[in-house]
Amino acid sequence: MKTATCSLLICVFLLQLMVPVNTDGTLDIIGKKKVKELLAHQDNYPSAVRKTLSCTNVKSMSKWASCPAGMTATGCSCGFACGSWEIQNENICNCLCLIVDWAYARCCQLS
């Protein structure tokens, strides 16, 4: 009985690892939240200069993904279902799990 239960738990765990993750959707949601936060704290005076927000994804085959010069990391996504990450120096995504095969950084620039 113990062997069957253990085998079942292992099968369930392996099936969870096989479920695909929609990283682009997750990064877009995080980016939109960040933009809303930035816009909520701007001055109430109309700007004479029109600003545009441009964003891109940067993929790395390691635990770190760096944004291009002049861009800021607004969110991260990590491989092997790692949900633990941090942004360092405003432009580097660092995945905090022990085993990670890729990292995405959502990089944006307001110009």
UniProtKB/Swiss-Prot annotation:
Highest levels in adipose tissue. Residues 1-23 form the signal peptide. GO terms for cellular component: extracellular space. Belongs to the resistin/FIZZ family. It is found in: Secreted. The gene is Retnla. Keywords: Disulfide bond, Hormone, Secreted, Signal. This is Resistin-like alpha. InterPro entries: RELM (IPR009714), Resistin-like_sf (IPR036262). Monomer. Disulfide bonds join 55-108, 67-107, 76-93, 78-95, 82-97. Probable hormone. Plays a role in pulmonary vascular remodeling. It comes from Rattus norvegicus (Rat). Pfam families: Resistin (PF06954). One of its GO terms (molecular function) is hormone activity.
